[in-house]
Amino acid sequence: RPCFTLPGCAAVNGIASFVSAPAVGVFMTEQLYRGRDYTDREGLTVLTCFSVCSLGFFGVLVSLGGIEHLYAQVVITSFVLTFVIAAICARIPPLSGKRDHYIDGTEQTAQDRVPRKIDHRFRAAVQAGIARSKELDFKVFMATLWSAITFTQKIVAYVVSVAIVALLLAEHTPLFTWLGMPIIPVLKLLQIPNAAEIAPATLVGIAEIALPVIMISGKGIAEESIFFITVLSSVQIIFFTESANAMLESIIPVTVLDL
């Protein structure tokens, strides 16, 4: 809570995307929001700051860029940057301006924000897990499965359509080249090689996370620049082929303008 203004359960929730997928992280956040574990502000903070691509997809990105030998460096750099950016974004608009109200409309109190003191944390975690497992029955399993299926169905159509349109715009129109022109001086100031060639790729990630790396792969781009674009793509978090659509389809109050 001191770093990210979030409750302790966000620690597990924040890692969910790293080990699975952004949409899974969003789904888990939505379930915690339904259970009054998060307020509007806390739920939106977790959605927009921690729904990072999975460790497996990091492998896809470095493979597309031809920098497989830098996989560990890409993951560690992205991991650190994600938490640094999250600590900043949680304290600035629009996240800082969201209400600290739960799903039922009740306002979070100062007592709610006080962390519980737990002795022997590992033992307590094991006992809580055992107790929780005893509550599981077939009806709960089917209800959760149905929620996951309907949630997936909502975003699949967007994933396919947005990815196709974004790829067509990136590969067959000069749109992103024009949009990337103001970025060239910034990249040159940072002394990043091939500034003009990679500038369009810095913006196209909002449509599809892998598209920036696809755009620059096989074009003789310096390894440093490929590393930069790969990390930038992963920490950008919000992309409309998956994470952004999952966020908009969740019950947590969020708008396109917020994203």
For every predicted segment, state its role:
Residues 25-26, 85, 162, 166, ...:
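Alpha-helical transmembrane segments of polytopic integral membrane proteins
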Residues 54, 77-91, 155-168:
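Hydrophobic core segments of alpha-helical transmembrane domains in multi-pass membrane transport
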Residues 129-220:
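Transmembrane helical segments that form the transport core of multi-pass membrane transport proteins
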Residues 38-71, 75-87, 209-259:
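C-terminal transmembrane helix pair
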Residues 95-149:
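Intrinsically disordered, low-complexity non-transmembrane regions of multi-pass membrane transporters
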Residues 2-51, 217-224:
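Hydrophobic transmembrane alpha-helices that form the pore/transport pathway of multi-pass ion
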Residues 14-24, 172-176, 200-211, 234-240:
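Short helix-coil transition sites and intra-membrane helix breaks within transmembrane domains
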Residues 33, 90, 94-102, 171, ...:
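Transmembrane helix-loop junctions in multipass membrane proteins, especially transporters and channels
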